[in-house]
């Protein structure tokens, strides 16, 4: 499990361990996983916290090698957590900021999957669960970099699902809407240019950021996402996609039933209140 120190990652690691999975909870910063460590020790869970920086090929390789050594060269389940959200209209996002967004959200997933895949293929079994977002299916304003990274995860997952099926490996995507978590805003980064009042997009950026803060309070619990991951992990035939949350389900239903023009208007009314 990647990015396990807080929020969805923490709840998912605990959910899996509480249901009998020997869980390796990866985190870039071990000091941020103190709560997870405390709960795990208190409940005597089969969970180990390991240092894992998904932006480093060496770190991912080292962590996977360690796990394989302890688990007789077998990994049954890989859960890739979402990463972070870069806010800012496209023109306000620099090339380097866009690249950093993809480096974590997309290439981080690529690194972990490439590291475990040969061993899953050898055993002709395994599950890969990528926690994405409803933003991987729909474009939203002021988040073009994040949305693009999630679309990339969706495309990668769909392609891998077909490629890996002959080897007994299942690939699923978890698509939550807004998640109610105290750390959620900390997982958001505003592009440098988007912070400036001189930006031609400053009004829309400010409005969206304010609305997101309000919507988070009405979002689903991270535990609900964790339960969905567990459901996919336990299934002999997991679904390609799991939409999590009433807001996500409602958005997808509207996307199917509306024209592009109608849906654009719906997004502006819902997200921007215009």
What are these regions (language model features)?
Residues 52-62, 95:
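The beta1-alpha1 cofactor-binding region of Rossmann-like NAD(H)/NADP(H)-dependent oxidoreductases
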Residues 89-90, 97-99:
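Substrate-binding pocket helix/loop in short-chain dehydrogenase/reductase
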Residues 113, 149-152:
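Active-site helix of classical SDR
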Residues 166-239:
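SDR active-site lid
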